[in-house]
Every structure is written in structure tokens, then in C-alpha cells.
């Protein structure tokens, strides 16, 4: 599917971003993060996404962008139709194929469409409207299949990792909506709309595959924020295990953890002794506003403002400002372009669209 023409207002915004974008460091990592797009097939969103891709392609020509990450809630799921949800996902994928850099997706809580399965006034969901992981994988997550250093977990799991050799950095893409699909009659025991967490399978993959033989620096990206108090985000099953694994990895320690649970059980051993690692940041979306701070596990955590329409929900960020979001203007979206310099150990984000640039004080 061809992009719509590059809007004049978006060209001006791209030029302003290009002027502010620092020269990419010799060993630097640069990536774009577009979260909570809530895409649907209307002209307004086709234009906004076309402008985003035109912008990133133009910036990529002069200042290489290593990848574009869609941070979950990639599709809007506003029609209560499974077929329309899948069609929107396919159109989104077709537009993203115009990007000149690798595109990697993570899953958000709106992406399986289970919100339309909910029994009235409850968070209990019947089966019928949900879009399973394998369909999401085949449409959106295969966009990364041509990326040389991307390693999917396999078996159509919606997580993987990407190595950036020139930056001595790995980026781990987690699935924070990784709940098992179990039916109790016609009721889903867990639904991805309101239930968050990590199965034992994903945690074991993290400890013994994604973090095995890792380079010095490792970023984590998922949909749900890692910092839960400031963002008022929902609790996640096995979040404590995720944090235990991550701390042991960073500190160069061994671990053996287990949990006896029918659906979220695990028994994981890993040995990270002999080398410590740096985790510059753990990055998420979901809350629809910009934030940063130290998360409960002691790591630096960042969220990025939603990239979708105003009626998807705008909120005040850390600076107390409600930024504009107006269609067919330079504020129609928000995309962070992160630049990490491992030599100087600095991390900045340059904002395309609504919001401001940020200079993070990483540890």
C-alpha cells in the first residue's frame, strides 16, 4: 500500500527535528519509538502514519535510524468486529512496509480486541471477538523477519531481541500481555485487555536466551510501563520474577527461582556470574503520557506519549503540561527518536510531533 503524500506541515516538522537531531555517535544506537497509535482505517490516521514514515525515511538517509519500534496498542479496535480489527492490522502492516529501517512491534493490551468480549460492567470476557497471538504475529510481527540481527523467540511468540553490534547493545522486546489462552466454557480465564503478565516460558526465554551472552548494554521495551506508581499501571503476573532476573543479570549473579502456579508457574535457573551489565533504560507506553524515573526494581524507566488521535486519550505528563493533539497539523502524533551513546553513556530523545525533547539522566 502506497503512502499518502508528505504533508507540508509534516515536512516542516521533519526539518525542525533534523536541525535538532544530534549527529549520531560513532558507536551510537538510534531508534524511533511510536506507541499507542490505535490505528484505524480512516484518512486522518493514514495521513498521520504516512507523514511519520516519510519523516523517518528522510531522517534515516542522513542520520541512520537502527529500527522503528511500535510500542503496542498498535491497532484501535474501535469497531466491535474481529474481521475489521484484523483488516486494520493488515493495513497498518502494509503501510509500515514503506519504512526504510527495520520495524519491530510489541503487543499492547488493545491489540487482541478482547475488549469487545467483555460482559457488561465487568472485566470478564467471553470468547468470540478476540484476535489470537498467531494472527497478530503473522501480520505485524513478521515485519521484523528481514532484520539481520533480530532474533524472535520462535513458535509465533510475540517477543524477541535485537542486537546492535556497533553499539555493543541488545534490545529486548517483551510481551507484557503474555497471559495464557484458557477457556472455562465460553469465558476466557485471562484476557489481554485487562490481564497483564509474563508466562514462565517467556521468563525462561529471557533468562536463558535473551540475556545469554549479551553485550554490555541492554535496553528493555514493552507496552506496559515498568514504573507502575507514577503511571498508575496495572499489576503484572510474575513482575517480581522479571525484576529478579533483570537485577541478577545486571549485577552478574546466579539465580534459581520458582513459583507453583497452574497457569503462571516457573522454575528458572540462570548463571550471570563473571560479567556485569548496564541497563540504560526500560521503555514502555500504555499510559499515554511522557514520564521518566526509577522503577521499583531500581532501573531507569521511560514512557512516551501516545502517537494516536486526541480521542484515544491525552494526559498530562511529568512536566504538568497538556500538549496539543490536532489532526492535520504538526501535533497530530508523537514519536520519540532515542539516541544512546555507549561511550559517553548518555540517552536523549528528540520529539517529532507534539511534546518536547528530553535529556535523560541515566545511571
Language model: regions and residue ranges:
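N-terminal active-site segment of His-dependent metallophosphoesterases
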Residues: 1-86
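Extended active-site neighborhood of metal-dependent phosphoesterases/phosphodiesterases
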Residues: 9-15, 79-205, 251, 294-297, ...
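Loop/turn elements at helix/coil->beta-strand transitions in domains of secreted/extracellular proteins
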Residues: 27-30, 63-67, 98-104, 167-170, ...
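Active-site-proximal beta-strand elements of phosphoester/diester hydrolases
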Residues: 28-41, 168-182, 221, 299-306, ...
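Divalent metal-coordination and catalytic microenvironments
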Residues: 36, 68, 73, 108, ...
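Active-site environment of divalent metal-dependent phosphoester hydrolases
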Residues: 40-42, 76-79, 105-117, 179-184, ...
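Active-site-proximal segments of metal-dependent phosphoesterases and phosphodiesterases across multiple
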Residues: 85, 178-203, 211-280
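Conserved beta-sheet core of the metallophosphoesterase superfamily
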Residues: 234-341
